[in-house]
């Protein structure tokens, strides 16, 4: 029997009810039929069907098209400190259960909706936490959540020194939240002197700048895909395109590649990749080049240098359904060029981090590129984001990374 909690009730359309029943945690503004009661922005509301069936409780976002983000489907939950601490502990215990202890040095601790913390991303980089808050509900709770999470991690032997807020993202404006970044003031503690920390992933050392690095500082979702590349790289001449700070290239070098060329259009990224190569004593086998991959790949067809392993890890070419067609064109161009460069027996690692470029669309693009390049591909494996970025069934938005390893036959 549902306890009386006094939250406002939001009656939703049958379409929204169906989505919620199937596991989706969002209610859009256009799906709300009736509202009874009031609460502040970021406050809790109960969501019910037209027939009065309780569907869940979530945070109200008055300025967002995603008007309610569910956090519970239990009508008797009490949303006190103990509730949130249990959820944080559950999220950390999940990572411990699916990852080797060494992989916990750098991992995602909460992945938004996949962990029922809508709009909250927490990445752990050795002894620093990098946090991004994209919903008003989580913003209102951060003074409860962040100290509690630090306490949970410290009690488990993780020496957390500080928490850095990476709220310098435009998406916050849709929630009516200001942008900014800086150290979160843990009660009674002095923030660390530097936002730069060393992590070790797959045996590779990286310097991560949680203040100035992309997103939260480093892309953790390719952890095991990088390992898969390293496993096949022995003796190969490798071209790593869109290298960013050199992570795939370094895994290939550590895996015994004969030579690696790491390419990125960003001069600063190339400098960081070069520094990471030096840090791992890989400079003798790894060259870092600043170039536009779209221009470079056609040029390489005319060069004597040949590669037998090409890695394509581009940034998201689309962040909306409206631009998917253009994105697919871009993906096809670089994959076609890479396939043309590879000899028989060569390897191709290719991926997309865009949710809107679905696996079906991406695979169709790869078939078309292979046909046009006159090659046949043998799939070694297909992969997704690492398990600390779990895919929650019923929430398609959590399923975004596609990664394929092929051999040209």
Where are these regions (language model features)?
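Non-catalytic accessory regions of SAM-dependent methyltransferases
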Residues: 1-126
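Conserved SAM-binding loop of SAM-dependent methyltransferases across substrates and taxa
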Residues: 245-258
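Non-catalytic substrate-recognition/targeting regions of SAM-dependent transferases
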Residues: 110-123, 142-218
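S-adenosyl-L-methionine
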Residues: 268-311
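Conserved class I S-adenosyl-L-methionine
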Residues: 235-244
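C-terminal catalytic and target-recognition region of SAM-dependent MTase-like enzymes
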Residues: 333, 347-409
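Conserved SAM-binding motif I beta-strand of class I
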Residues: 259-264
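Mobile active-site "lid"/loop adjacent to the S-adenosyl-L-methionine
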Residues: 307-337
């Amino acid at each position: 029997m549902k306890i009386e909690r006094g939250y406002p009730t939001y009656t939703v359309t049958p379409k929204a009810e169906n989505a919620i029943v199937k596991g989706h945690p969002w209610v859009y503004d256009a799906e709300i039929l009736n509202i009874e009661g009031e609460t502040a922005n970021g406050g809790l509301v109960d969501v019910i069907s037209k027939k009065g069936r309780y569907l869940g409780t979530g945070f109200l976002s008055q300025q967002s098209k995603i008007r309610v983000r569910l956090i519970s489907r239990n009508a008797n939950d009490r949303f006190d400190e103990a509730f949130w601490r249990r959820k944080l502990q559950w999220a950390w215990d999940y990572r411990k259960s699916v990852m080797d202890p060494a992989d916990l040095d750098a991992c995602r601790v909460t992945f938004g909706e996949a962990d029922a913390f809508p709009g909250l991303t927490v990445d752990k980089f050795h002894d620093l936490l990098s946090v991004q808050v994209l919903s008003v509900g989580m913003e209102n709770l951060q003074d409860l959540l962040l100290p509690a999470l630090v306490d949970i991690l410290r009690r488990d032997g993780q020496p957390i020194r500080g928490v850095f807020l990476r709220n310098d993202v435009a998406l916050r404006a849709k929630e009516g939240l200001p942008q900014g970044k800086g150290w979160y003031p843990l009660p009674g503690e002095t923030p660390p002197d530097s936002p730069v920390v060393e992590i070790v992933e797959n045996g590779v050392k990286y310097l991560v700048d949680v203040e100035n690095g992309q997103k939260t500082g480093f892309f953790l979702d390719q952890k095991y895909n990088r390992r898969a590349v390293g496993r096949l790289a022995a003796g190969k001449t490798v071209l790593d395109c869109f290298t960013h700070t050199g992570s795939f290239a370094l895994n290939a070098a550590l895996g015994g590649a004969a030579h690696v060329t790491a390419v990125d259009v960003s001069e600063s990224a190339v400098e960081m990749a070069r520094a990471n190569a030096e840090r791992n004593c890989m400079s003798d086998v790894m060259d870092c080049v600043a170039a536009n991959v779209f221009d470079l790949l056609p040029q390489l067809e005319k060069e004597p240098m040949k590669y037998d392993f090409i890695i394509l890890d581009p940034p998201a070419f689309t962040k909306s359904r409206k631009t998917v067609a253009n994105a697919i064109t871009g993906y096809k161009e670089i994959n076609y060029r890479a396939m043309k460069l590879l000899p028989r027996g060569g390897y191709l690692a290719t991926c997309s981090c865009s949710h809107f470029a679905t696996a079906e669309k991406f695979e169709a693009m790869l078939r078309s590129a292979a046909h046009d390049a006159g090659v046949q591909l043998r799939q070694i494996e297909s992969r997704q984001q690492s398990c600390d970025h779990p895919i929650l069934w019923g929430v398609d938005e959590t399923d975004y990374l596609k990664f394929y390893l092929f051999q040209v036959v």
